[in-house]
Amino acid sequence: MQIIADLLNTIPAINSAAMSRAQRHVDGLFKPVGSLGKLEALAIQLAGMPGVNGIPHVGKKAVLVMCADHGVWEEGVAISPKEVTAIQAENMTRGTTGVCVLAAQAGANVHVIDVGIDTAEPIPGLINMRVARGSGNIASAPAMSRRQAEKLLLDVICYTRELAKNGVTLFGVGELGMANTTPAAAIVSTITGRDPEEVVGIGANLPTDKLANKIDVVRRAITLNQPNPQDGVDVLAKVGGFDLVGIAGVMLGAASCGLPVLLDGFLSYAAALAACQMSPAIKPYLIPSHLSAEKGARIALSHLGLEPYLNMDMRLGEGSGAALAMSIIEAACAIYNNMGELAASNIVLPGNTTSDLNS
């Protein structure tokens, strides 16, 4: 779809001059150079994003949760009933799920988006971008057509950009869908070139005696559909799912506005791999929240070149890790904007020079 290609070509480059200025500012704060570690690096990364205009700050916050069912559930790769997707999506509208509680704590709004739940009628309270009642069974057919993937990508990109126009400056991504770690593993295996046995995990507490079947399903899906690892849309359409496409769309939409996206867990890593194949320019806008406990997490993150800020043994999904990490983003902005400067008190510390302080 040409409109997507045109939009991806307009993703702004990171402002290296703004990052250099931010580095000098951070080095001149009331502290030894580097003593706030990754918070300093995060503040400098944010300063380089054109959407924040050189000064790290957080306006409105939003977690976009993509909800969809998966045909591959029929292969016995998940123990939860498929109906749980719809039930939990409805619970999200009541604010009672994990991501909703954590997002409320962070002061973020949760946008629950139906991109492919298998119900006869749309669920009240959800944003309706449904493509179909669940994706195809990737063990026997593609997840969707390329046209469906591109249309959903564009819809989510446009929705994300509209939120940015309305003041959202920090995005988080999440998902909801029974059996969705299976297509996620297929994406990770395809793009990283690693064998499914290395990336397939237990998902939502799959018994270990069923893991061999899940690995076999992922291997069959890749062999049958032959996704092109260099083509992110092709990978998503052939072995992905509507929720994974939606997450990729948020990343592309936010990056096109020069704004950061907090990743969540394994599903978001898989979507990020596909999105970065579409546009490597989005990578500096991706901020990893936590290390998922899912087996292939480190493989995916290593391929992305990302190191998460938290390691909480979490694997809930939903965007829970992204919501939890929003306070870290705000902390990085706070030190940048609110700490005093050494030069104002005529303090020179080892590692700081007078020229540094006055620059």
Curated annotation (Swiss-Prot):
Q: Which family does it belong to?
A: Belongs to the CobT family.
Q: Which HAMAP family match?
A: CobT
Q: Reaction(s) catalyzed by this protein? A: 5,6-dimethylbenzimidazole + nicotinate beta-D-ribonucleotide = alpha-ribazole 5'-phosphate + nicotinate + H(+)
Classification via InterPro entries:
Nict_dMeBzImd_PRibTrfase, Nict_dMeBzImd_PRibTrfase_bact, Nict_dMeBzImd_PRibTrfase_N, Nict_dMeBzImd_PRibTrfase_sf
Instruction: Report any one BP term from Gene Ontology.
Output: cobalamin biosynthetic process
The record lists the organism as Shigella flexneri
Q: In which pathway does it act?
A: Nucleoside biosynthesis; alpha-ribazole biosynthesis; alpha-ribazole from 5,6-dimethylbenzimidazole: step 1/2
Q: What is its EC number?
A: 2.4.2.21
What the entry lists under CDD domains is as follows: DMB-PRT_CobT (cd02439)
- Domain of life of the organism encoding this protein: Bacteria
- Tell me which UniProt keywords the record has, alphabetically: Cobalamin biosynthesis, Glycosyltransferase, Transferase
Q: Which GO terms describe its molecular function?
A: nicotinate-nucleotide-dimethylbenzimidazole phosphoribosyltransferase activity
What does the record give as the active site? E318 (proton acceptor)
Q: How does it assemble?
A: Homodimer.
Lineage, highest ranks first: Bacteria, Pseudomonadati, Pseudomonadota, Gammaproteobacteria, Enterobacterales
Gene coding for it? cobT
Q: What functional role does this protein have?
A: Catalyzes the synthesis of alpha-ribazole-5'-phosphate from nicotinate mononucleotide (NAMN) and 5,6-dimethylbenzimidazole (DMB).
- State the protein's name: Nicotinate-nucleotide--dimethylbenzimidazole phosphoribosyltransferase
Q: Which Pfam families match?
A: DBI_PRT
